Regions:
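Active-site and adjacent substrate-binding regions of carbohydrate-active enzymes
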Residues: 1-211
Length: 211
């Protein structure tokens, strides 16, 4: 059976009139504790999936409460390191993970694309914008659901295409992930160097998923 249960988009679970309904406090954490009490006797590990900007420090709150956090910072940091030939921001994050004993599950590509909103507070905003422009220039797409101010949520692209469909860059990115602190996850499409499929997007239309 399952050993780890992912709680997808968990921060949106508790709802209340007049609240922002994203990570409502204390309701979100109380609900998570209730699930934990059900899961613990079964030996299940919970993995709350929460997208939030680095500057909000929600990953630290998860760590303080004894949960692992999805490392949604790593995908953008690795692209930044490879394309801009610098490792300072990536190294800063790696040091923080080690020094603060933050338990992470990391990834590069995924079915939602490449998360970039999460980098706010870790990368300068101009650099985030440049990453978006680079990935879009390589065939990535941005679905703007909430207006210009939130345009850089996730860029819909495979990781291989985001790296310019370069075998050497993809291998380097995967090596960095494997040696990064945390438990690595590999999206099945990345195993086969999957490329952006614009024809599939066209066929799916507005109601289709993003990948």
């Amino acid at each position: 059976g399952a050993a780890i249960v992912r709680l997808d988009a968990f921060a949106y679970a508790p709802k209340a009139p007049g609240k922002k309904n994203f990570l409502n406090d204390p309701e979100t954490w109380e609900f998570l504790q209730q699930i934990h009490e059900l899961a613990a006797p079964l030996g299940l590990t919970l993995l709350p999936e929460i997208h939030a900007a680095y500057e909000e420090k929600i990953y630290k709150t998860l760590a303080d409460k004894g949960y692992a956090t999805y490392d949604f910072f790593l995908p953008g940091l690795v692209i930044d390191a490879i394309e801009n030939r610098r490792a300072d921001y990536l190294a800063k994050w790696a040091r923080e993970v080690v020094d603060d004993k933050i338990s992470t599950v990391n990834m590069l590509g995924c079915h939602d694309g490449i998360p970039l909103l999460d980098l706010k507070g870790l990368l300068p905003e101009d650099d985030i914008r440049s990453l978006i422009d680079l990935i879009v220039s390589r065939g990535g797409m941005v679905k703007n659901l909430h207006g210009q101010k939130n345009i850089y949520y996730q860029v819909n692209a495979t990781y291989y295409s985001a790296l310019g469909e370069s075998d050497s860059k993809m291998l380097l990115a995967r090596a960095i992930q494997m040696f990064m602190p945390g438990k690595p996850q590999v999206w099945y499409l990345d195993l086969f160097a999957g490329k952006n499929d614009h024809e599939a997007v066209r066929r799916a239309g507005e109601s289709g998923h993003k990948e």
